[in-house]
């Protein structure tokens, strides 16, 4: 078992026990790289598109006769060599960016990230994170009480007060356990989990 420091709003700190298979793994840089790369690739919409000569709007009439003008021969105004013409070999939304990653590897990668965050003192637990009213200043004051900046908070449930109070803060992200992702875990300076989510994270990743 490993121990995660749990901070109370009054400043008191105690250690809570957590599974070593989730929060005590050896760091595997190659696995984390593969998990992050796969997540970013699968998030791509794949909708970029460029217009070829058959897609652009323009006349398909031959611009001048083939011979006798002294100018280079030409055809339609949609010719890629002309200004306003189509693009040679245009990108089409037929590319498949999906990168398959086994569930076992993904979970192992997430466990590795949590373990490394804990080793670097970037992962802490708090007793709870409840907001009494949907006010941003109330949420900001609560963060100051815990001395937290640029933080991602993982909670078991986001009520309407917490959602409304936190959505306008640029350096705060509040997510439920089922919606955590590797990129967000690595993007913030601190990751905070509520006390009741420790077991839920273990159940999801084991």
Curated annotation (Swiss-Prot):
Any one GO biological process: translation
Coiled-coil zones: none
Listed InterPro entries: Ribosomal_uL4 (IPR002136), Ribosomal_uL4-like (IPR013005), Ribosomal_uL4_dom_sf (IPR023574)
Keyword RNA-binding in record: yes
Disordered: region residues: 47-77
Alphabetical list of Pfam families matching this protein: Ribosomal_L4 (PF00573)
Molecular function via GO: rRNA binding; structural constituent of ribosome
The entry's keywords: Ribonucleoprotein, Ribosomal protein, RNA-binding, rRNA-binding
GO cellular component, one term: ribonucleoprotein complex
Assembly notes: Part of the 50S ribosomal subunit.
PANTHER family, alphabetized: 50S RIBOSOMAL PROTEIN L4, LARGE RIBOSOMAL SUBUNIT PROTEIN UL4M
Family to which the UniProt record says this protein belongs: Belongs to the universal ribosomal protein uL4 family.
Main function: One of the primary rRNA binding proteins, this protein initially binds near the 5'-end of the 23S rRNA. It is important during the early stages of 50S assembly. It makes multiple contacts with different domains of the 23S rRNA in the assembled 50S subunit and ribosome.
Stored NCBIfam families: rplD_bact (TIGR03953)
Name of this chain's protein: Large ribosomal subunit protein uL4
Organism in which the protein naturally occurs: Nitrosomonas europaea (strain ATCC 19718 / CIP 103999 / KCTC 2705 / NBRC 14298)
